[in-house]
Each structure stands twice: as C-alpha cells, then as structure tokens.
Amino acid sequence: MVASVSQQALGPSAGPIVSRAFDAKPPTAEREIDRKLGRLHDHAREFARLGIGKKIELLRDIQQRTLQVAEEWVRAACRAKGLSMDDPVSGEEWIAGPALTLRNIRFLIRALGEIQTRGAPVIADKKVRDLSHGAVAIEVAPYDAFDAALYGGITAETWLQQGIDRGAIEGHQASFFRKSDPQGGVSLVLGAGNVASIPPMDVLYKMFVDGNVCILKMNPVNEYLGPFFERAFKTLVDKGYLEVVYGGGEVGAYLSQHDGVDDIHITGSDKTHDLIVWGPPGPERDDRKRRNDPVLKKPITSELGNVSPVLIVPGPYNDVELRSMAENVAGMVCNNGSFNCNAAKMLVVPKGWKQRDAFVQQLSNVLAKVPPRNAYYPGAFQRYESLTSGHSDVRKIGQGNDRVLPWTLVLGLDGKDESERNFYTEPFCSILSEVSIGSDDPVAFVKEATAFANDRLWGTLSAMLFVHPTVEADAGGKTAVEAAIRDLRYGTVAVNVWPALAYALCSTPWGGHPSATLADIQSGLGWVHNTVMLEDIEKCVVRSKLVPTPKHVYFPGHKSVHRLGRRLVGFEAEPSWLKVPGLAVAALTG
C-alpha cells in the first residue's frame, strides 16, 4: 500500500509529492507532543548532571542496539529509494546510515573518556599548526591508529577563528563539561529527509556535546526510519531523555513555537529556516529582518544546503589524472541520487583551459556508466525543469522517466550574468552546471575563482579545489592555493576530495561558514559531529591526493561497496585489527 501525503504536511518548500514505497505515519497529536515535552523537561536537569561514566554507558547501549537494527534500517532505506540490497550502490545506505552513526558513537565514547580523565578531548601539541593569519589549525583526522590505517591518504584540520592561539584552545573546547551546575534544556531536532545518519547524529551532538535532552521530529520523506531510531535509542527514550515525533510543517511549527522547547537544530532548506525564524514571506517578514526582530525568540542552529562549487585549478593533468578527477566529480554528483546538500553542483573551470573539453568528455563517459536513480525527493522534477530550461548546452546522460531523472550537465554558463538562477538555486537533483572564469594561469584563476564562489554562488557549506602536485610544488602556486583555502567562505574546504568527508569523518565539524547571519542564513549557523568538541570554529579543511589509491569508495562503479559498507558497520561497532584486512580487501576489489 502506498499512502498519500498532503503538500502541507511536507512543508512550504517541499514541492510535488513523489510516490511512496512506505505507509505514511499519522502526525503526532498536539496533546501527545505536550506530554512528551513535559516528560523531557522533567528529565533535562537529570541528564545534564548525569556522570560522564553513565553517559558512556548510554552510548555503549546505543552502539549495540544500533548494530542490532542496522540491516533492517538499510533494507528499509533501500526499499524507499528503489535500490536492491544486492546492488553495490546499496553500500551508500550501509555507510551513510548505521556505519557513520556508529563511528560517531565510537568517537563520542573516546571523547567522554578523555574528558573524564583529562578534562577535555585530548589534542596533542604536534597536532596544532599556527596559521599565517593569526589562527590555529588542529589536525583531527586521522583520529586514531585505525583511521591512519584505513584512511591514511586523507587528513583533516579544524581551523579556529582568528585570534585564538594554541595556548587558548582548551578554553574553546567542551564548554558544557566545564559547567559546575548545568541546568540542561530541551532541544528540538528537525530531522533531514535525505541522509539516514543525519537525524541520529544531530541528536547525538545536542545530547552528548551540548548536554540537552531532545525531541526529534522525523522528516516525512524518510519517516520510515523513525522506528529504527527509537529502537536504537530505546534506553534514552525509556529514561525520558529522548522523544521521537512524526508529521510535516504543521507539527514542526507547533514544536518550534512551543514553550517547552529551549532551542532548535534544523537540517533542511533555507526557506523552511526563514519561515520558522521570520514568519511567512511578505512585507511583515521584510520589516522584521530590517528591525532584527525574529518571530522565533529562541536559539536556532542549522545546516541548509549549498550550490557546491568544484574549482579546477589549471595544471598539467595527464589522462590518468583527468579520469580520476572525472570519477571524483561523478561520485560527488551521483551519490544518493544527488540528493545531498554537499553534492557537486557547479564546476568552476579556467577560461581558455585547453583540457576543458577532454575533462567534460571524461566526465560524460563516467556518468554514462552510472544508471540514473529514482528522484525520490519532493520537488526534484520541478527544480530540474527550472534549472535546465533556457540554457543552450544541456547534455542529458541516461534515460529518464516519470520516476527517474537523467544525469545532466548544464554547460557554458555566463559568469557575469547576475541573474543566472543556477548560481543561486540549490538543484537538489541530478544536475551539474559549469562556468568558465578568469584565465588559465593558476595564480590568477585561484584568486578569481575564490571571489566568484564567495560572491556569486549561493551557500557557505562546502567547496572543493582540484590542485595538481606541480602547482602545490611551485611557491607562487602554493601561496595562492593556501590563500584560497583561507579566504573561501565555506564551512568545509577540501582539496582533491569530496568535502562530504568532513561530514563522514565525525571528528571533524560539519556546518556552514560562521559569516552567515540569522537574516542572511546561507547554509546555516552552528556545527555538528565535531567529536573533539572544539568551539569558535572558522572552517574544516580536508586534503587528499589527486589520484587516490585505492579509489575513494564514493567513486562510481565500485563493485564491492555494499560488502565494504556491511563490514564497516561491524567494524565501527566493535573495532579490531582483525577486521582491517577484510575491509582492505573489500576496498581494493572495487
């Protein structure tokens, strides 16, 4: 049976409803919400003051229960998205669902243990680097010896805001655990509908980093996951520390304005955020923004999407490198059917780049081998039509139908056209656009591309640069690239790798750049994951080799990513060196 769902239930910016592979849950009644919030309020102070050892016990309990529901969870997600459990692409659901949730739990257990013994998550002095602009960078990945073995080619740093020196780091870390008399509070988490690990990981952050109890409202798009989360977090529910509710925009609005909610975290769209914070569009909202008088009178943090740029710095790329870059970009586009806030959405290439046509052909060849996916997220077909119509060079790759959208390149946009909607509209569907700017001089291009990404593209979540080793080896090139990493106003800046790794590594912070404001929210404010519990963060910087060996698991065509994903779930639940060879074999046979 496929249940019908009203447009209103999904919220104001959801778009048309796609057919469902699951029965819709009835919205939680207001009186039941009142009861749940009252119960949470009664236990908020108790949870805030719970000993660290007790919180570690709770996390270990969640860890085991998450492992127990993992296969059912993945099966439900695959069914909803039209995937076969036997298809390698189902590995996306293993990895982006229970595996990352378990990794987050594992790192939180370590962090709490270090707080218990040392007062804060441990940061070795050798992991701290002074930056030229008066800030510090803390290496947070590899986070442990397992990370070094499994992801040795990837490094990540958390950059703190300018003016915080290495001697002051501990004062900008784990502040909740420095409180002598915490009162706690009730946090509302408005769950995302696209990636299965987002709701539970947002809950974990609000509870075990911020110290609040939580009410999680499931998104109607993936509300089928709610019962698995309730089972995985059962002990928290039983103790009055967590509640899960269901419904669309009306339930979200009721919760957001409820006196029993102290603060809010939302993963969704900027339109939904502004509706909550400023009220419906119109003169009254505009006036409220001018007066800085939001309707919402409580704190809100958010992660709201992006027109994610990929900047290709010119360099002497050979055929192997161009092929790897094409696979990299295709993976960033195709993962989860392109319904990711960090999916590659705007190629920014040098004007006059001699390898441009060869790269586009390589990318087209890779995409042609990836079967198009169900466009399961509401509004995808309408956004697709809006962002492809009126453009002169639109290349559709693969066949679409009433459920499937083809991978699509929208090429040759005019970088000077301030009205170009692809620059300010997040596609959240299978589109990748391209624009040529600047020149084919690496130093000049990097400077112009940074300004273009900052000033012309919507969003502040994540950006990526492809950089050839010879450019980094050149003093002028390296200086220009490092300046771009510093100056790009994005919460994550990645070199040669998908910025989504900052989401997946968990020791890294994930969120929009802090330059946003409540009135101009861009990709949101605040951070999640961040198991090192750093505060006053500027951004995360992730780096990898131009041609990774083995290939990153998100590259299309990996033949064993479903087996790798299943093994990762078991590993993250109970890590052991005995499990590493099996993971390596699964990765290498892709």
Indicate residue ranges for each PLM-predicted region:
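Catalytic cores of nucleotide-enabled group-transfer and carboxylate-activating enzymes in metabolic
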Residues: 50, 57, 84, 272, ...
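NAD(P)-dependent aldehyde/semialdehyde dehydrogenase
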Residues: 315, 335, 341, 349-461, ...
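PLP-dependent aminotransferase-like
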Residues: 198-250
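C-terminal core of ALDH-fold dehydrogenases
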Residues: 57, 402, 446-559
